[in-house]
């Protein structure tokens, strides 16, 4: 806001709040500027006044032009006599039931900035079906942290090599588009929709391009072909429902172990739980316990989030613990590609449960028969008839006919997924002189004449370094799939390592345009973008491997030293600082509160409620549903999200936050242990990320744990630290 009119001298306080102007007078609607100083506007000057047309100026004058008793005048439009303008020929074909969409280059625009060409293989097209009049609908209408509306997957369409696409969609239907990678996971989310008129050609330059962008003067592959028809999903177009889409995946792959007979999450179907929002509400919902047990392992934006354009892959499936566990190898389970694609779609659609509207006629004042009436009117006036209830029923029948619904047979093999167990025991690895205690670690480090150094970025911004001596150790372990088998690793030369993760202040000293942004809240009615992750002393995040290396290159040019990311071998050696345990301070069962910022009891405050959301009360009946992030409840590290670096105790070599706060990029390619494979550099796509973060539990934050991301990804909980080898 630049200035409020009237009240030109009243200071502007930037407040974001639902019902901000409730009880505030005068109230205004639909201002129409006459020139720089005068405006026609609909105004209600007081609670008991009429809505009328007023002339408002920059001199604080409010002059009534017209009002009418019993009426509200709300649309001031000045008219002037003029010649009839040229008639623009119609761009629609009223009898058509389709529209055409043309995307010139999906890699153009802020939404896919930095995504390498060739990454996007297809587009997922889905349609929204909105709620009914006075029927129960809210941000939890479709699930926990899911959304308001039904999402119907219409199909997919390939993207051409040059990034172009030309395809048909149903006319008069609100559709949304998601660009997919080779695995079928969305790289970006379109958080709005478009609607094509019958016969219309809808076009855009790219993905969330600037509104002032003009088409690029080039011929595209798609424009030289016929518009493609959508490839409809197997089983037909239908709303995405947990019970019919995801539960069969759990039945085939998970319930042989996750069956309620142990401490693991129970993924069996038909274990129903009642969800009731608020003491006075009459709306009771039923959720499968399997849904409530699975969705906490999915990272997603929820019904509302920061309105800033999302970084590409912000909510990519690889950011979800569920997918990382499965990709790393979970107790020998190899989930078929078809089932993985189903999980990706579930995540990309915000992890819904219902995919339907329930209890439509619950409220006494709700019009009856709305479902049929909507179809009748939609068909009459737009030629579209969406019977989402029938689509769900038809798909359920299709599942039964194809023996995919009950987990009795597998999706493609005719059997439940086989769990592959190790065929032979793995021998323990021993390294002479390892492990060693804190006293020995300190002594090894002290053998260097000087153990601390400082790199200067600007006169006011520095990076502190500490010396890490050479040595040998047991790298990895034989318990974690991604970190096995354990093997002897050698760090032949000592090196200098930054004592902390690179901070926002340090990174912005060289890349001032970078913004680590915010961590989103759950619930809705947000009054801020979220919890700040961009304060000066917090570790930089949403920074790609490529950008981390660019930072190292600039520091090298400034200092004259060779600055780089550590290899994962250097990183683990430094993190262990002599320890063979999960952490330098103990095991995954240890109290980490004084040592690392991990997922602890403070994360309960991520469960919020209300207008201007605040943490839920401990006795709130909804808290058990919304306090879902996996955590260690008996530890308190006193930090909700990432915190200023060096807030906890350092390890014996003076390194802070190695296992927590945020995870860290390394220089290494993600190849199997024991790292002897001569990797084809072009074939290795991902880079290794080490350590854990504020939203991860100890077992996923150990010194041995490995994660992997594409070098252009900018995860919200990954940063980096640097090493220098030749100071």
Predicted segments with their positions:
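Structural motif
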Residues: 1, 48-54
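Surface-exposed loop and turn segments in beta-propeller and other repeat-based domains
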Residues: 2-21, 71-73
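Signature of short aromatic-glycine-proline-rich micro-motifs recurring in repeat-based ectodomains
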Residues: 19-33
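Beta-rich catalytic cores
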Residues: 27, 49, 72
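Residue position within the beta-strands of beta-propeller blades
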Residues: 39-42
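Aromatic- and Gly/Pro-enriched helix-to-coil junctions and flexible linker segments
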Residues: 70, 80-83, 92, 115-120, ...
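A short glycine-rich, aromatic-capped structural motif
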Residues: 454-521, 543-546, 660, 726
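Functional-site microenvironments in short loops/helix caps that host divalent-cation chemistry
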Residues: 474, 479, 525-537, 542-705, ...
